[in-house]
Amino acid sequence: MVNRHSTDIDNCFWIEPTMFKDHRGIFCEIFKNSHSDTSFKPVQSNYSSSKKGTLRGIHRTPYAKYVTCIAGSVYDVCVDLRPSSKTHGQYFGVELTSSKFNSLYIPAFCGHAFLALEDCVLIYQQDHEYNSKLDQTY
């Protein structure tokens, strides 16, 4: 079970999973395709670690991303850089933390940036394989 939260950015949302805790530890579903209501199908997963205070982005790619913080915390931002979008130029930010295992879905052609609020580790799932020729940095 998850709570799916809409944002002001067209097709951007964030997920807050239900965590099951007991004396052994924690279990939660950080991604399930039926949670997304999109055609998102991950084909690549990436690991990214950053030191506290690191600012990364804004990176724009032609593929969608699903970002989860598995250690520490970040302020994560989606920027709508799609010229034909009704929400073009708007942005949405959310704190992603390893204590909540919440995730942000970033639509294709939107920008992505984050500030590491503490040392952190992010896992990105993408619906296409990375191609450096298609990556744009602002």
Regions found by a protein language model. Give the residues of each.
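Conserved metal-binding segment of the jelly-roll/cupin
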Residues: 96-118
